[in-house]
Design a protein with these regions (language model features):
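Ligand-site clamp/hinge motif
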Residues: 48, 69, 76-122
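Ligand/substrate-recognition segments at binding pockets and active sites
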Residues: 67, 213-284, 356
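Gly/Pro-rich hinge or "lid" segments in bacterial periplasmic/extracellular proteins
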Residues: 17-83, 88
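Structural transition elements
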Residues: 181-214, 231-239
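Extracytoplasmic/peripheral linker and loop segments enriched in polar/acidic and small residues
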Residues: 161, 173, 254-265, 293-361, ...
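Long beta-strand-rich cores associated with HINT superfamily self-processing modules
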Residues: 358-383
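Periplasmic-binding protein-like
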Residues: 16, 151-191, 236, 342-350
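A bilobed periplasmic-binding-protein/Venus flytrap-type ligand-binding module shared by bacterial periplasmic
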Residues: 74-79, 136-162, 310, 354
Length: 383
């Protein structure tokens, strides 16, 4: 098989091997509305079929899907490889960490995800329960819209710098739980080119106050922060927003938190670039630092903050340079330059890289944390 790309993409191998790309039986997909025509992006209608059925060659097949409730996977009788001894998985949506903890302790479930520090502490030492810890590539960030129509005062570059200086990053890590890190910039720990962590002594309230005064707000200002009802690996975005509110009160910024459900308008406003000030999270679409380039001006996420390529053409040009660089040393240099450029400037502040904690029954083996799908069900066996 030969792939012909229309433009350079130094992350192509990472994309092809990530869980979001799957090889399907083309005949089955076409029978159910799929197409490989040039206009497939607008004419393919196989999504509804694939939401409730399988067309691949993996170890498990999808036998039941109830949105927002449950997914059932059963062993594929035609699987070509060596199978594990688990015949069926029932995946249930349960956002409450305490309920997960209790049902795991009682033996009603075998694996619990998105647990909090408190529930993990309760499970430590529990009979027949084991805990696996790790660091995800998921990040939480503050977004300040560059378009004054939506961002108001937070669209001012000096105000953005002041907010960056005022945040208590170590306190944010405490809220997110053990294992959380604060990335230096937009490239997470674990990715090629990452410059590590933002130092704790970066926070400086007096400098933040001066920056705010320089921007014309010596007495601060009031601003709405719209936040959704989502969570980041069990960490409620509303909790992060409250911490940001508390931190910014130290420099005279009065934040009014407005909570809005994702489906009730927040999601559309976020994607359409009409949110002025928010706390949000980002999960990677593939395991390569290039996925973070979408935060640059003109990128998918950049435009959600009103950050067009015209605002910072030099930084926007680094997107193309990073995509074209196939030599690892050259890629690393470009990625480091991008991180330095966004360390103190821009509408995004990465405030946390989320940890992952999985608790599971000790009767299971090989329950490990994976970047691409949290846990790999094809590796788990019953002892």
């Amino acid at each position: 098989v030969v792939f012909h790309l229309t433009e350079p993409d130094s992350a192509i191998l990472s994309k092809l091997t990530y869980s979001s790309l799957a090889v399907l039986d083309s005949a089955v997909v076409k029978e159910n509305g799929g197409t490989d025509a040039e206009d497939a992006a607008s004419t393919d209608t196989a999504q509804s079929f694939l939401d409730g059925a399988s067309a691949g060659s993996g170890m498990y097949i999808l036998t039941s899907y109830t949105p927002d409730e449950e997914v059932v996977l059963e062993k594929n009788p035609n699987y070509w490889g060596t199978s594990t001894n688990v015949d069926k998985y029932i995946l249930k949506i349960q956002p409450d960490a305490n309920t997960q903890m209790m049902t795991l302790s009682s033996g009603d479930i075998d694996i619990a995800l998105n647990l909090t520090d408190d529930t993990l502490e309760e499970l430590k030492g529990a009979e027949n329960v084991e805990i696996t810890d790790g660091l995800t590539k998921m990040i939480g960030f503050v977004m300040m819209n560059m378009d004054e129509q939506y961002g108001g005062p937070v669209s001012d570059p000096d105000v953005q710098k002041a907010i960056r200086k005022a945040l208590d990053y170590s306190g944010i890590r405490m809220i997110c739980g053990e294992g959380t890190v604060t990335p230096y910039s937009i490239i997470q720990e674990g990715f090629m080119g990452s410059k590590g962590d933002r130092p704790d002594d970066y926070t400086n309230i007096e400098e933040a106050k001066q920056l705010l005064a320089d921007a014309g707000y010596p007495d601060g200002f009031s601003v709405d922060m719209t936040v959704s009802d989502l969570d980041m690996e069990g960490i409620q975005l509303t909790d992060l927003a409250q911490k940001v509110k508390d931190d910014l009160s130290q420099i005279g910024i009065d934040v009014n938190i407005v909570t809005e459900a994702w489906a009730a308008g927040y999601g559309d406003a976020y994607r359409n670039g009409t949110l002025g000030f928010t706390v949000m999270y980002w999960g990677v679409d593939y395991s390569d630092p290039n996925v973070q380039l979408e935060f640059l001006p003109g990128g998918t996420v950049g435009k959600r903050a009103g950050w067009t390529a015209e605002i910072d053409p030099e930084l926007a040009g680094m997107y193309t340079a990073a995509m074209a660089a196939t030599d690892n040393d050259a890629r690393t240099q470009v990625l480091e330059n991008i991180q330095d450029a966004m360390y103190e400037d821009g509408p995004f502040i990465v405030i946390a890289q989320a940890p992952a904690h999985i608790a599971h029954s000790s009767r299971l083996a090989n329950v490990d944390i994976f970047d691409s799908y949290t846990i790999d069900l094809t590796e788990i066996n019953v002892k």
